Amino acid sequence: MTENSNDFSQLRPGLWDTVNERYPDSMITRDELVPLVRPVKTLSESRVTFVSTAGVQPRGTLPFDTVHPVGDYTFRRVPSGSKPADLEIHQLKYPTAGAKRDLNVIFPTERLQELTADGIIAGLSENFISFIGYNMDAERLERTLAEDIADAVEAEKPDVVLLAPA
């Protein structure tokens, strides 16, 4: 899709065909398109929230269950005003050394705060959302965790949601 394109009908035509071919035994298949919505506000007028699979959470909160064989189907709210020193990573499924040196690499709280201070974005939601991406039960992921996260994001009332895998 080009900058001047008026085709906002779907993110990637044929996406679900590719997913369904790659994972033929998956319990979840899709054939409908993924609709896109034309933004109604500029970024400088938009409230932004962030959702990540990095397993980042406020220090002192219940750690994610990183050793359960099918994963952890919970999420954590992370105050958007957090500093990296206020946060920790509970994740065993990817190397975290780089992220521990600079958490903004995977959970950019300070960069988003700077964009707000510079007026690039209007503001941040009260909380960001974090969970661990290692979840082996696709049906449970979709029917519980994804629904819970969607409800939590909706409650933050953002205009824009940034989604980032770890």
Language-model segments: residues:
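Metallocofactor- and cofactor-centric catalytic cores in central/energy metabolism, strongly enriched
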Residues: 1-166
